């Protein structure tokens, strides 16, 4: 089969041939239809400090996908050949305290598809059957291919009650944009998103935000005044990992405000803890998706009419992966799809 891999400890990815894997008794073999490029894949492509410390070489990469089951292990009775699936990319142990309590997203021994074990940038992928998720017919292949990051957005956005609330999102990358779409869909009053990338702020307008703010040009306080906000934001969703963005968020949160923090800072940074203490702010770290409660919720958000298609901006045949990564590296994209059937 054709595979896109990190074959040597250097920038880039390489397309090559590899043996088609065989599923074990509790696994499924999936023929990949489409994959999407994640920020994690960019880290691996660039071979930055995180990738050098984390990724074994060689490694088939990629973890956002949709495909069709073509072989089922003897113990995987809940699935069948022909099922169209995406999959949870976090493989958990099943035996630790959190796994046994039904909190698999908190497993201390999580292994990542395309990070610690062979990934989805391949014609075929093997994952545990319990990690495969059947896709309703009304959800397109393009949307099914981005359910993994959509799950990050849903986990973050739905962590706190948003109905009637004023919501601030820092970071208009794909997950921030999807979070904004969710907040609007479930009934937030004002949804304000900040970034420094005008291309992505324009995408934010397409998903229905109240205001898309370039934080280098317009103070948040000015936007709040224009919206008639007299207090502060009730809910914050930090998606950027940027220290200054988070510090700015803290200054405009209402007393008793709640923050879901998904962005990954490149290094530790200081904040004004007086903002946290005297405002009685609640800050909740978010990682991955609740298995599989988040999957149920995000599927039904889509089936109830939530449209995240404007976030998908480019699609390339798999053979043109280099062009796809070049576009991603430009910063002028939303989600980028690789088609493995072309």
Curated annotation (Swiss-Prot):
Domain of life from the UniProt record = Bacteria
Q: Binding positions for NAD(+)?
A: 175, 195, 200, 262-264, 286-287
Q: Which Gene3D superfamilies match?
A: Medium-chain alcohol dehydrogenases, catalytic domain, NAD(P)-binding Rossmann-like Domain
Annotated EC: 1.1.1.103
Q: Which GO terms describe its cellular component?
A: cytoplasm
Positions annotated to bind Zn(2+) 1: 38, 63-64
At what residues does the UniProt record annotate the site feature described as Important for catalytic activity for the proton relay mechanism but does not participate directly in the coordination of zinc atom? 148
State where the protein is found: Cytoplasm
What single Pfam family name could you report for this chain, choosing any that match? ADH_zinc_N
Q: Which reactions is this enzyme annotated as catalysing?
A: L-threonine + NAD(+) = (2S)-2-amino-3-oxobutanoate + NADH + H(+)
| HAMAP family assigned to the protein according to its UniProt record, in alphabetical order | Thr_dehydrog
Described by its record, this protein's role is as follows: Catalyzes the NAD(+)-dependent oxidation of L-threonine to 2-amino-3-ketobutyrate.
Protein name stated in the entry: L-threonine 3-dehydrogenase
Species name: Coxiella burnetii (strain RSA 493 / Nine Mile phase I)
């Amino acid at each position: 089969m054709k595979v896109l891999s990190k074959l040597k400890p250097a920038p880039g990815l390489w397309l090559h041939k590899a043996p088609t894997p065989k599923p074990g008794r509790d696994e499924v073999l999936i023929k990949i239809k489409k994959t999407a490029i994640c920020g994690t894949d960019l880290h691996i492509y660039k071979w930055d400090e995180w990738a050098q410390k984390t990724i074994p070489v060689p490694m088939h990469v990629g973890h956002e996908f949709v495909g069709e089951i073509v072989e089922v292990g003897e113990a995987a009775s809940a699935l069948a050949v022909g099922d169209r699936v995406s999959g949870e990319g976090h493989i958990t142990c099943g035996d630790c305290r959190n796994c046994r309590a039904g909190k698999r997203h908190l497993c201390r021994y999580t292994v990542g598809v395309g990070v610690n074990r062979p990934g989805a940038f391949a014609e075929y992928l093997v994952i545990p059957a319990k990690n495969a998720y059947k896709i309703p017919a009304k959800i397109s292949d393009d949307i099914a291919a981005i359910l993994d990051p959509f799950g990050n957005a849903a986990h973050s956005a739905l962590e706190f009650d948003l109905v009637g609330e004023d919501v601030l999102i820092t970071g208009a990358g794909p997950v921030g944009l999807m979070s904004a779409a969710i907040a609007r869909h479930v009934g937030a009053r004002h949804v304000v998103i900040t970034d420094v990338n005008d291309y992505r702020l324009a995408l934010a307008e397409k998903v229905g935000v109240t205001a898309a703010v370039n934080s280098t040009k317009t103070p948040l306080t000015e936007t709040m005044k224009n919206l008639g906000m007299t207090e502060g934001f009730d809910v914050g969703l930090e998606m950027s990992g940027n220290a200054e963005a988070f510090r700015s968020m803290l200054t405009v949160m209402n007393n008793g405000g709640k923050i879901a923090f998904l962005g990954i800072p490149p290094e530790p940074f200081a904040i004004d803890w007086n903002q946290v203490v005297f405002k009685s702010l609640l800050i909740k770290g978010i990682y991955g998706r609740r298995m599989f409660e988040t999957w149920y919720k995000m599927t039904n958000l889509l089936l109830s009419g939530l449209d995240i298609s404007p976030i998908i901006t480019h699609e390339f045949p798999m053979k043109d992966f280099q062009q796809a990564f070049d576009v991603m590296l430009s910063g002028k994209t939303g989600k980028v799809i690789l088609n493995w059937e072309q």
